[in-house]
Amino acid sequence: MRAVVSLAVVFVLSYLLGSLVAGVLYSRGRGEDIRGRDLPGGSGTYRQYGKGAAAAVTLADILKGAAAVGLALWLAPQALPLATALATFGVVFGHCYPVWFGFRGGGGIAPFLGAMLVVAPWTLLATVTFALALIPLYRATLQPRLRLNAIPFATVVAVPVGLLIASRLGGGAEFLAGSAAMGIRAVHLLAEQRA
């Protein structure tokens, strides 16, 4: 029973932490709301406010992902990897659907990176390297035909490869949990664009 309570606390605290979306906080500090023009992650903040703001927002979002997993390691060490998977899902889902900001948040990439940085840094490094290597190849071959931004394409291809890498290097449960939360958000964003 105690483990169940610990897991519930980990999930709720991770979700609430994820709901503190740095891009929204930054833009509100300027008397605006970035979500009226863009997503509140690092890329949207870069487009709206420049490099310095984007770096600060991205770092804050990465740190909250790392903090959520650290919280899981501290509160529920007896329930690993379930605790860290719940923390990863919670912080990413909270970033995407923040309770503090009307359930309208970012895409979840930075908190996912932060969580994976703590749980499975080698899995993260290998997956990001693979995704970045795909981008120039995609732009040279498929992008003219598909007319889809390179980042979503690289993400779609890198997630299954990342799961394969995680099965060898570790962090599979957390990788799957974070990918699931980002996948829900991606489907939601695509549905909004088509409506």
Swiss-Prot record:
<keyword id="KW-0472">Membrane</keyword>
<keyword id="KW-0594">Phospholipid biosynthesis</keyword>
<feature type="transmembrane region" description="Helical">
    <location>
        <begin position="4"/>
        <end position="24"/>
    </location>
</feature>
<feature type="transmembrane region" description="Helical">
    <location>
        <begin position="73"/>
        <end position="93"/>
    </location>
</feature>
<dbReference type="GO" id="GO:0043772">
    <property type="term" value="F:acyl-phosphate glycerol-3-phosphate acyltransferase activity"/>
</dbReference>
<feature type="transmembrane region" description="Helical">
    <location>
        <begin position="171"/>
        <end position="191"/>
    </location>
</feature>
<dbReference type="Pfam" id="PF02660">
    <property type="entry name" value="G3P_acyltransf"/>
</dbReference>
<feature type="transmembrane region" description="Helical">
    <location>
        <begin position="150"/>
        <end position="170"/>
    </location>
</feature>
<keyword id="KW-0444">Lipid biosynthesis</keyword>
<keyword id="KW-0812">Transmembrane</keyword>
<keyword id="KW-1003">Cell membrane</keyword>
<comment type="subunit">
    <text>Probably interacts with PlsX.</text>
</comment>
<dbReference type="InterPro" id="IPR003811">
    <property type="entry name" value="G3P_acylTferase_PlsY"/>
</dbReference>
<keyword id="KW-0443">Lipid metabolism</keyword>
<protein>
    <recommendedName>
        <fullName>Glycerol-3-phosphate acyltransferase 2</fullName>
        <ecNumber>2.3.1.275</ecNumber>
    </recommendedName>
</protein>
<feature type="transmembrane region" description="Helical">
    <location>
        <begin position="52"/>
        <end position="72"/>
    </location>
</feature>
<comment type="function">
    <text>Catalyzes the transfer of an acyl group from acyl-phosphate (acyl-PO(4)) to glycerol-3-phosphate (G3P) to form lysophosphatidic acid (LPA). This enzyme utilizes acyl-phosphate as fatty acyl donor, but not acyl-CoA or acyl-ACP.</text>
</comment>
<comment type="pathway">
    <text>Lipid metabolism; phospholipid metabolism.</text>
</comment>
<keyword id="KW-1133">Transmembrane helix</keyword>
<dbReference type="GO" id="GO:0005886">
    <property type="term" value="C:plasma membrane"/>
</dbReference>
<keyword id="KW-0808">Transferase</keyword>
<feature type="transmembrane region" description="Helical">
    <location>
        <begin position="115"/>
        <end position="135"/>
    </location>
</feature>
<dbReference type="GO" id="GO:0008654">
    <property type="term" value="P:phospholipid biosynthetic process"/>
</dbReference>
<keyword id="KW-1208">Phospholipid metabolism</keyword>
<comment type="similarity">
    <text>Belongs to the PlsY family.</text>
</comment>
